[in-house]
Curated annotation (Swiss-Prot):
Organism: Arabidopsis thaliana
Zn finger (PHD-type) start-end: 199-251
Subcellular location: Nucleus
Residue ranges with Low complexity bias: 150-160
Domain-level remarks: The PHD-type zinc finger mediates the binding to H3K4me3.
Protein name, as recorded: PHD finger protein ALFIN-LIKE 4
GO terms, molecular function: methylated histone binding; transcription cis-regulatory region binding; zinc ion binding
Site residues by UniProt (Histone H3K4me3 binding): Y209, W215, D219, W224
């Protein structure tokens, strides 16, 4: 198994792009695709690893046969602990090891292509601006997203961000918008802290809002998500009366 094929990023920006692609794939495995990931991690099979690829795909497979491998290898045997602990704890454990692997791969490229102190520091800062996979899986990133977000929970503010769609009834599928100045003053110091922390973050990937992206809000946990992260298109969203994110859907299914 080659963890990424022949693609070799050579600049800080390319390594970071590689990191983000692998990270996005592993987050999908542990969140939106968690049922398939759980099924593939059969404890009866040999040592299995979770791989993230630069194209945002993920894969459960055996480790590389060549020694030493072309790239650092992820942790072995994630399937063995699947049935021996609570699912949430198991996913968190895989997430922690996945974070360690992503850093190992990124700084492997940095060492291989001679990044100097400034390059390594810049790469680390770029990586550190994103929530870890563990934070996303454990829900910490969602909490941070709520703290950082200045999105209002009432329909009037949602309708502002959906004005281009021409209907308040579709406001929950809009792009997140900051609150009005008057609302910020009413909420005092707490709101000021939120402003300092930044914009709305996607509850799945943890990345901040950017222009020309479709977002959707979960009606249960009231978190915002990239449509692409939860596999919802604008056309599909028009026919959803109450949207539930994958995390909320899984909780209701297990209860």
């Amino acid at each position: 198994m080659e963890a990424g094929g022949a693609y070799n990023p050579r600049t800080v920006e390319e390594v970071f792009r590689d990191f983000k692609g692998r990270r996005a794939g592993m987050i999908k495995a542990l969140t939106t695709d968690v049922q398939e990931f759980f099924r593939l991690c059969d404890p009866e099979k040999e040592n299995l690893c979770l791989y993230g690829h630069p194209n945002e795909h993920w894969e459960v497979n055996l480790p590389a046969e060549e020694v030493p491998p072309e790239l650092p290898e992820p942790v072995l045997g994630i399937n063995f602990a699947r049935d021996g602990m609570a699912e949430k704890d198991w996913l968190s454990l895989v997430a922690v090891h996945s974070d360690a692997w992503l850093l190992a791969v990124a700084f492997f490229f940095g060492a291989r292509f001679g990044f100097d102190k400034a390059d390594r520091k810049r790469l680390f800062n770029m990586v550190n601006d994103l929530p870890t996979i563990f934070e996303v899986v454990a829900g910490t990133a969602k909490k941070q997203g709520k703290d950082k977000s200045s999105v209002s929970n009432n329909s009037s503010n949602r309708s502002k961000s959906s004005s281009k769609r021409g209907s308040e009834s579709r406001a929950k599928f809009s792009k997140p918008e900051p609150k009005d100045d008057e609302e910020e003053e009413e909420e005092g110091v707490e709101e000021e802290d939120e402003d300092e922390q930044g914009e709305t973050q996607c509850g799945a990937c943890g990345e901040s809002y950017a222009a020309d992206e479709f977002w959707i809000c979960c009606d249960l946990c009231e978190m915002w998500f990239h449509g692409k992260c939860v596999k919802i298109t604008p056309a599909r969203a028009e026919h959803i009366k109450q949207y539930k994110c994958p995390s909320c859907s899984n909780k209701r299914a297990r209860s």
